[in-house]
Each structure stands twice: as C-alpha cells, then as structure tokens.
Amino acid sequence: MLSSVCVSSFRGRQGASKQQPAPPPQPPESPPPPPLPPQQQQPAQPGPAASPAGPPAPRGPGDRRAEPCPGLPAAAMGRHGGGGGDSGKIVINVGGVRHETYRSTLRTLPGTRLAGLTEPEAAARFDYDPGADEFFFDRHPGVFAYVLNYYRTGKLHCPADVCGPLFEEELGFWGIDETDVEACCWMTYRQHRDAEEALDSFEAPDPAGAANAANAAGAHDGGLDDEAGAGGGGLDGAGGELKRLCFQDAGGGAGGPPGGAGGAGGTWWRRWQPRVWALFEDPYSSRAARYVAFASLFFILISITTFCLETHEGFIHISNKTVTQASPIPGAPPENITNVEVETEPFLTYVEGVCVVWFTFEFLMRITFCPDKVEFLKSSLNIIDCVAILPFYLEVGLSGLSSKAAKDVLGFLRVVRFVRILRIFKLTRHFVGLRVLGHTLRASTNEFLLLIIFLALGVLIFATMIYYAERIGADPDDILGSNHTYFKNIPIGFWWAVVTMTTLGYGDMYPKTWSGMLVGALCALAGVLTIAMPVPVIVNNFGMYYSLAMAKQKLPKKKNKHIPRPPQPGSPNYCKPDPPPPPPPHPHHGSGGISPPPPITPPSMGVTVAGAYPAGPHTHPGLLRGGAGGLGIMGLPPLPAPGEPCPLAQEEVIEINRADPRPNGDPAAAALAHEDCPAIDQPAMSPEDKSPITPGSRGRYSRDRACFLLTDYAPSPDGSIRKATGAPPLPPQDWRKPGPPSFLPDLNANAAAWISP
C-alpha cells in the first residue's frame, strides 16, 4: 500500500510560511559564483556570517553533497565523523537504549549500516544529535544488542524471546546476512518459516474480502450475505490455488473502471463467476455456502450408508429367473435355463440415484464456474467425484441389455462400486481435523520412508534368522528340517517378522525351539525401538499443524489494519530536495553583472508538478506566465506577480511503498538506490560518491539535505525519463533582481531542453 510523505518544497514565500515553528534557518550554503572581471564586479553586499563549520566542501561526482553538517562541533566531527583514531568511542542510541562501543569494532563488518557510522560524513548522513553526542536509530533495542555483539565476537546468535520475522527484519535493516547465524541458533531462527509454510497450507481467501469483492462486482444478494464463520481459515490443499485464482479475479473485477468488469457495464460472467464458485467451493464464504456445504455433507453420508447397507443380508434378495432359449440342436424343443441373480432392495437404488443426481449437479457447477479448468481436473478430490459418478450412469444405461458383453461390463461396474467409498475424502473440505491429517501425512513423507526402510531391514534380517534358528534341533530323519516348525522358508518368515515387529502377534505362526524363541524376543524389541524413533516426529508434525489450524480459526478477523503514519515535519525521514549545484560560467552571461537564470527544475519521480517551477518577476510572460497572450507550460497555472502570493509553493508528495515487509531496511533496496546507508554488498565508495542522508531534527538546526527518497531525473529528447548525466544545471539566484531581458533566448532554450515536446 502506498502512503504519502510530505516534503516541503521551500519554493516561494508561501512555502516558507507553511513550516512549523523552528529555529531560524541558516542561509543555504552554495559555492561562491565565479569571479567576474574587474569591470563587471558589483559592490559587495552585506550577507550572513560564515558558518562555523567552515567553507562548504566541494561537490563530489554526480553532483552529490559532500559538505560537513552545519552546527556540528568540530570535536564531534573529529570523534564521529572520521577524525581521530580507531580507538575513539561512539555512542549509538537505538530505541532509547544507549550503546557505546569502539569505532574499530564497527569497522569489522565493512559495507554494513553500522560501519557507515565510522566514515567522515556519517554525522550528515545519519541522525546525529550534537547535544547528546550520539547517533539515533528508531529500531528494536533488544535485537540490536545481539547485532552489536556480532561485531564484537564475530558470532551471531538469535534471541529465543524474539519472533523470527522481527529478527529477520532487523538483520536486513542493519545489513547483516542471515546466513551468518550460528548453527546452534539456526533452527530457532527458522522456526517462523516452518510456521509460515504451515499457515500457507491452511491459507484461504479472506471471506470478508471475497464478499466485498463480489458485492462490488454486482448487486447485493440476500442469499449471499457476508457472514464469515469461526472456521473461515481452512481450505483443502488441492483446491486452495483455485480459490486464490478465483478471488484474485474477483478483486480485479471489483476494482476495475466503471465500464470494465467491476463496473455497471461488467458482464454477467464476471459478476457471478466468483460468487457461484465460492458458493460450492468455500463453505465459509457466505450463509448460502454453508447451506450448500451441509447439503453436500448430508448426501455424502447417505451415499456411504447406502453403499454399506447394500452388502447386508437383510437387503439382498436372491431370485431365480428362468429364460427360454432355442435349442442349438435343429428340431429340438426350446430349453429353459434358470439363472440365479442377486438383487438389492429397490429403495436403496433410488436413494443412491438421488445422491448421484446431487453429486452430478455439484460437479457440473464447480467445473463450469471454475477459474482454471486444468487445475480443477488435476485435483484428486475432483477425480474421485468423477470416478464415483460414472459407474452409476453406465450401470443404468446397460441394465436393459441382455448381451454377454453388456453383462460382463455390468459385472465389472458392480465391482467398481467400491469407488463410492472414496467420497469420504470429500469431508476434508468441511472438517479441519481431516485436513490436518492430510497435511501431516504429506509433511511426514521423509519420516514414513525412514520407518519403512527400518522395518524392511528388520524384516529381512529376522526372517532369515528365524528360518535358520528353527533348523537347530531338527529331527535327523527330516531332510528339509521343516516338519516341526511353521517357518518352512524365508518368505513365510517375512509375515511373522512384520507381525512381531509391529507388536501385533496374531499367533498363527510362532517359534517352537529355544533358539527361535530367542530370535523372536530380539525381533519384538527391535520392532519397538524402530517404530519409536520416527513416530514422535510425525506426532510433532500433527500437533504443529493442528495447533496452527486451531489458532487460525480462533484468530479474530482484522477489520482495521494498522498502517504506519507518514513521517511528519521534524522527523528524520521528513526531508527536502537538495538545491542544485553550481554550473560552469555561462558564455552569454558575462556582461552587466547580470545573474544567470536558474533552470526550470523538472518534476522528480513521484513529485507533483506543482512547486517544480520557481516564481518571480523574471519569468518570461510568453513562456511561463499566463496572462495577455501567455500560454504557460504543460498546462501549469500562471505564475503570480511579485506582490501576489505564490500558488506553486506547495508541498511536494513522495510515494513510499509501505507493502515492503522491511520498508526501513531492505539491504537490496538500499544497495540499489544508494540510500540511507553505505552501499551494502557493494565495493566501498569514496565520500564524494555517496549521497548524504538527511539528519534528524534531533539536532537543533535546520538545513536542507538531499532526501534519500529523491534522485535526479531529466527527460530525454524522446520524452522518456532518465537520470540526469549531462552538465549541471544553473545555480539558484535571486529571482527578484532586475535585469535586462538579454538572457531570455537562453531561458527558452533551457526550458526546451527540460520539457519534452
């Protein structure tokens, strides 16, 4: 989600009046203009006193600031800004907790955020408080203690009382790789990922969000009221992706334009497809979906009950049917053949027919309104539905045929009736425990394979041992030595070993010799130990999935999601664009002491066009000013006269992506944008190559700094936006100074260079 951060433009008189009460700002530091020839020099005018910080530092490559922070004591700059030796101490205030360490300690991990505090321009790039002589970071103080200890000892441990995502976010902010976590804490660190993966398997579309999307897509329906149940979080894994696809489509249609899928001109399909799909697929999406789920559950139970009763003797009728056939012998009388047929009660067949009709209707509705037919047919539950329905229709269609082929097919279909029992798996859509069992079996595949391997090895070993142990003490007259024992060969011993190792002990086979009894005792003990090893892992998986499923069901629905407030004026993140750097002397501005015109600043990425153009009496009436014949540029409003308030001096808006889980410290984003911290995972850069960061308001001074949210962009000749790499723009001058209009042609050329046609 995008939220706006207001950044004052400081252009015009009205913009300055919008600022909150603050100490008197110091005049902006800009390099002195190039010396003019003696005949062109103007009389010196009184100006503000020089800053105690000394003359401004020269510009670095890329027109980035590299001057020291104004108002910062020289001693502090020497201590924190790069002066002094590695033995100097540094104070870091993290979330109100002060930490003190040596600068040499922070340099042990170059390229990280803390290592940037030891660089010369650290006081200007980070939030430095000259009064308290400390750097401030509004982050988690408890996690920072572990991070700082990593710099001291070289070992990164994970606190047990901190949630994994929080620790991961803090590591990303400080620029530390998570792979540096010690092996002893790695399992503790990644526990949150296991929990997130387990929750994703139970993840479902938000019932409220789905209903809102459906309501926005069309008219309200009384039978589709939004009433999320207590168990609105569970879905079967086979159809979860289909549900997400459907609700994504619903959300896209609901948020579309008025004439699109979500507006009044939307099609009937886009309006009703998500609703009908949720009606038959997600029992927690609405009250009507609950009724459909209850009906489906009722017919499933009736179908299974009917299937079981068909095998009971009380519902089976044996009938003898006599069929007269022509004798194969010519001239012989017809023969009467009596066939014995087994039939079930007719009412059971009628009940099964009603159930099949419901299952057919449900299957057709689900496959018709499914957002992805391919994914639908890949689902195991949907395959079971289709296979359980087809035999009934084939049996009804072939029942009237008397050919031998038809009877063979009918016999096969009666055998295939057992597929109907698989409908019991459809209950997983309605019961959390069954879904938990399914997820547990899938998550414990490795443990099951390990258990099978252990059992296979034990069965092979003990079956061989019992075969030869029973041969000890055999009758000398018994050539095979198997007359006195049940174990006549090793394959028979496999069955005995499985029964013994699983502690079942049917008693159909048992050893009769003392050596065989000893082998049997060892087999039972080995079976207990073998099964006991992987079973706790499977039980733990079941407990984890069950607890997460219950927690997800009992988790209250969040109606109002917390969104962090945008930085306010006076906060470290409330910053202003840097004034443009000085240009080289212009060849056409060397006479009469006339100040060269400032450039027409192009709107930066994410900044409103208003406020991008300065105002003043210098403005060319046909280029920027509206009025008598004035056209203005790009549809901008006319600029005011000197005595009029400036409507363009308004706050610029910069958009920050708040959806980033680590909005304040994604190391990849910081490394790509060269923002807010030294480049992470990149070679060390000179101080001139790095963009300074706005110091916080905790220092008692006010000064314009380069905002880490802004980068310099210029339009290319073809109208596209690109980073400015050409000559630096003209310096800011006093627009109130009168001067002849000799520079107007150059101003037009400058405007044409900045503004795409």
Swiss-Prot record:
Coiled-coil segments: none
List the subcellular locations: Cell membrane; Presynaptic cell membrane; Perikaryon; Cell projection, Axon
The annotated consequence of D746N reads: In SCA13; uncertain significance; no effect on channel activity
| Domain observations | The segment S4 is probably the voltage-sensor and is characterized by a series of positively charged amino acids at every third position. The cytoplasmic N-terminus mediates N-type inactivation.
Q: What does this protein do?
A: Voltage-gated potassium channel that plays an important role in the rapid repolarization of fast-firing brain neurons. The channel opens in response to the voltage difference across the membrane, forming a potassium-selective channel through which potassium ions pass in accordance with their electrochemical gradient. The channel displays rapid activation and inactivation kinetics. It plays a role in the regulation of the frequency, shape and duration of action potentials in Purkinje cells.
Region feature Important for normal N-type inactivation, mapped onto this chain: 1-78
Locus of motif Selectivity filter: 503-508
Q: Where is the composition biased (Low complexity)?
A: 41-52, 210-219
Outcome of swapping D477N: In SCA13; uncertain significance; no effect on channel activity
Annotated residues that bind Zn(2+) are located at: H157, C163, C184, C185
| Record-linked PANTHER family | POTASSIUM VOLTAGE-GATED CHANNEL SUBFAMILY C MEMBER 3, VOLTAGE-GATED POTASSIUM CHANNEL
Q: What is the effect of changing R423 to K/A?
A: Decreases protein abundance
| Membrane topology term | Multi-pass membrane protein
Q: What is the effect of changing G263D?
A: Changes channel activity; activates more quickly and deactivates more slowly
Membrane spanning stretches: 291-309, 351-370, 380-398, 412-434, 448-469, 518-539
Record: glycosylation sites: N320, N336, N483
Under catalytic activity, the entry for this protein gives:
K(+)(in) = K(+)(out)
Q: Which SUPFAM superfamilies match?
A: POZ domain, Voltage-gated potassium channels
Return the protein name.
Voltage-gated potassium channel KCNC3
- Positions contributing to K(+) binding: T503, L504, G505, Y506
Give the originating organism.
Homo sapiens
Question: On the Cytoplasmic side, which residues?
Answer: 1-290, 371-379, 435-447, 540-757
Give the result of R366H, as annotated. Answer: In SCA13; uncertain significance; dominant negative that decreases channel activity; decreases protein abundance; decreases protein stability; decreases localization to the plasma membrane; no effect on tetramerization
Pfam families found in the cross-reference section: BTB_2 (PF02214), Ion_trans (PF00520)
Protein family (similarity comment): Belongs to the potassium channel family. C (Shaw) (TC 1.A.1.2) subfamily. Kv3.3/KCNC3 sub-subfamily.
Stretches with biased composition (Pro residues) = 21-40, 728-743
On this chain, the residues bearing Omega-N-methylarginine are: R625
